[in-house]
Amino acid sequence: MSGAVCPGSFDPVTLGHIDVFERASAQFDEVVVAVLVNPNKKGMFDLDERIAMIEESTTHLPNLRVESGQGLVVDFVKSRGLTAIVKGLRTGTDFEYELQMAQMNKHVAGVDTFFVATTPQYSFVSSSLAKEVASLGGDVSALLPSPVNRRLQEKLNG
């Protein structure tokens, strides 16, 4: 059985992330979305909210589950008996950074990383951009799953 981790902070999860999850889900028997905690970063959504939004947005993927994690992604992968990391790439800048991380993960723990080129319609989408546009009153419904857009609007409108 093959399994992979899709790691990230997902604050919040976007349709670009969901696209990567769907494509990973088609290639691996098991996919774990690892919602990572960065103690040095205060997000808009807390960990439980981020997990809930991903779960609500991925009910159509029966071989996917969502968990929280901290520390090295390779430790998360190994502790769950999984074999790979899947990362989406939007730009060449993403590739340069992620390639370096992939090589380190292979060196440190023997874990392979699979890169998924972003579907063109999502190549500009990021969590930060969606939050910024929404905070300025812009429509981000084409960037976020419906449950996420609803929660984002609730957060912003208090």
Curated annotation (Swiss-Prot):
Q: Where does ATP bind?
A: S9, F10, H17, G88, L89, R90, E98, Y122, S123, F124, V125, S126, S127, S128
Q: Which CDD domains does the UniProt entry name for this protein?
A: PPAT
Q: Pfam families per the record?
A: CTP_transf_like
Entry keywords, A to Z: ATP-binding, Coenzyme A biosynthesis, Cytoplasm, Magnesium, Nucleotide-binding, Nucleotidyltransferase, Transferase
State the coiled-coil residue ranges. Answer: none
Q: Where does substrate bind?
A: S9, K41, V73, K87
Q: What subcellular compartments does it reside in? A: Cytoplasm
A GO cellular component term found in this entry reads: cytoplasm
Q: Mostly located where?
A: cytoplasm
> Domain of life, per the record?
Bacteria
| EC identifiers of the protein | 2.7.7.3
What are the GO BP annotations of this UniProt entry? coenzyme A biosynthetic process
Record's subunit section: Homohexamer.
The protein's job, in short, is:
Reversibly transfers an adenylyl group from ATP to 4'-phosphopantetheine, yielding dephospho-CoA (dPCoA) and pyrophosphate.
Question: What name does the UniProt record give this protein?
Answer: Phosphopantetheine adenylyltransferase
Q: Which organism is it from?
A: Mycolicibacterium smegmatis (strain ATCC 700084 / mc(2)155)
Gene name tied to this protein: coaD
